[in-house]
Amino acid sequence: MPIAILSEHNDLADSVRDLVKRVAPSEVLHEALETPIANPPTYWKAAAEQGLQGVHLSESVGGQGFGLLELAIVLAEFGYGAVPGPFVPSTIASALISANDPDDKRLEALASGDAIAAYAIDSGLTATRQGDGLVVRGEVRAVPAAAQASILVLPVAIDSGEEWVVLDADQVELEPVKSVDPLRPLAHVRANAIEVGDDRVLSNLSRTLARAVMSTLLSAECIGVARWATDTAAEYAKIREQFGRPIGQFQAIKHKCAGMIAETERATAAVWDAARAIDEASETSAYEFAAAVAATLAPVAAQHTTQDCIQVHGGIGFTWEHDTNVYYRRAIVLAACFGRAADYPQQVVDVATTTGMRSIDIDLDPDTEKLRDEIRAEVAALKAIPREERNTAIAEGGWVTPHLPKPWGRGATPIEQIIIAQEFASGRVQRPNMGIAAWINPSIVAYGTNDQQQRFLPPTFRGELIWCQLFSEPGAGSDLASLTTKATKVDGGWRITGQKIWTTGAQYSQWGALLARTNPSAPKHNGITYFLLDMASEGVEVKPLRELTGNAMFNTVFIDDVFVPDEYVLGEVDRGWEVSRNTLTNERVSIGSGEPPFLASLDQFVGFLREGQFDQIEQHEAGRLIAEGHAAKVLNLRSTLLTLAGGDPMPAAAISKLLSMKTGQGYAEFGVSSFGTDAAIGDPEQPSGKWADYLLAGRATTIYGGTTEVQLNIIAERLLGLPRDP
């Protein structure tokens, strides 16, 4: 999934992608490995004709008048194409000048493509004040595109602080140096007592904003590289055969490719969030945090995915002639352009524990305010109802699951659902908690008879009926096609015998959704029927399973010749697989949308860090975990916005579920490891015992609702198109 969500952003990405394909095919990239790149490159004019050099610049200087998000979309496509030459450095340099003054006349030549600029994120330049200007001395090492540029935007140290200056290339001494990536030439820049007037000092550009702009836009190119590596590895895995089948059918390759797309999507979400934060001109801490998150994740994603792409290709990936050579080199140089890698996770920790993390909010169109006012009034009316009657009113109004069709829901659009959730939260009106029923109710609505709907849905929505899900079996786990619980037709119903396991909350449930095999001669996914089981029926025995935490959330359920009337068959006989697929889809959306209550949350983790003392290595690890946790939340936001835009939210939702559970485990592992010998204390009243509980409970999160390994298979097959197991 690219950065773009809105249709106009997708159109922009498509147009840039078309240009990149034309001007930077593989043969052009490999030619640039051997021979110097023309200056300006041959594509420069075509890019200027599309307005790409000035997409982010003000119309007052000939730009397109858009923002950093649009430029990030452009740079991601240039990264995907590993486009040679100075385009990315030049647009980042112009973004710095624009951040200081969007009407700066120097931007006119940059917007039109008549000039090329370069920048550095760090430098060894120092300045002393002389009248109204500065005198600059020193050296900046390994500046990308410096030898191709006519304008240089560089930081200088002065008075224990930092200023940014704009120098002409003919004022400095340039020493070209060999670049790891020949497509991105480097040069050392030396300044020998250069006098710089105050009109060349970017006095409105703070160090915080400058670094946020640079790191966000560099990160955008990184995710383009990562996406190319992921796509290329997956495509090769589909066609390369070993041992008589495509290598993409082997689970080891599937999991590697799924890990690549997961890491890429996480970094993409972070870049999108950072670019939006800067464009919103929100509080400094918000964009500082978001940009540091992007810089923590994106260059690592580019390096990991290009390395894995080489690995998937095997020997051919380790040749000079293969494109993997080009992209791995680009990833290495991009990572270097960020400066010290450890600075960014440290910055994440510093901002998170002082001014706070960037909030995750959904901004809706102002046209929705009338709808919001109406919903707010209805929520206020519900709040005025006596508490003992309120749940009935909420249920009858369709507020519990508003996306369901009337009368069970409100037939709410995605936008309405968001507003309803926001207004119930802000109005402090609590809706009945559906628990497992949140996954079962949609199946009853979709497949149930009128009698079944009337019998079960109203009391469930009122919170009076508790449900469990009787799917998994010993030996089969979540492999529903292999279930062996048997249902035999008898007069007026069915006799069911079997055993279910890992049934959450069965000891508290009045009803269960049960799958049983009704036709053993049918293919594995056929011959299964979906039953609604009264848990008080004779022959049903529930035995709690004590988990490694000492608690008993799961259960084994023994079903011994239990009679289930025909009226409790949901959907058609032998077609229960279809009904269960509806339930499982609801399960995945639900689990992927939040943090489990028994797992340490991101906010709890940051609070823990705020109260403790940690060394640099620990802070670096903590910053990485915070960045990953924040990006997982942004993935959820993107999933919601994709739904609003009519797109497919599945990739972001599936990957968010996969990543958020692993990150939650990471919080607990970090917390426990920080206690030293006290980590052995299991008293939940003590901080170490509390985090030990999180650590123990967290092992379940990568198992229930689909194990990590199964999720990786699903991601590889559904998102990357790798072949299914035979």
What spans do the regions from the language model cover?
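A short, Trp-centered hydrophobic/proline-enriched beta-strand micro-motif
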Residues: 113-123, 463-471, 515
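Glycine-rich phosphate/cofactor-binding loops in nucleotide/flavin-utilizing enzymes
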Residues: 2, 73, 92, 315-380, ...
